[in-house]
Amino acid sequence: KLIEFTNLVNECCSVMEDSYVADWLNKPNPDLNMEVPIDIFREEGMERILRLLYFIEIGEADV
């Protein structure tokens, strides 16, 4: 799980400012039905979050 978390943080850093990643992971996100990304990671894994990061990267979702 630690390696997966590290990979998740690296993915986040590739699409947003490094200094914002911790806040982003711990705040309810409207693009995730107001769920908290880190909670989704713990309960489901990375897939939904990686999909959102992709949409952020291509400009289809906001950070």
Model-assigned labels for residue ranges:
Residues K1-V63:
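Non-transmembrane "mature" sequence context
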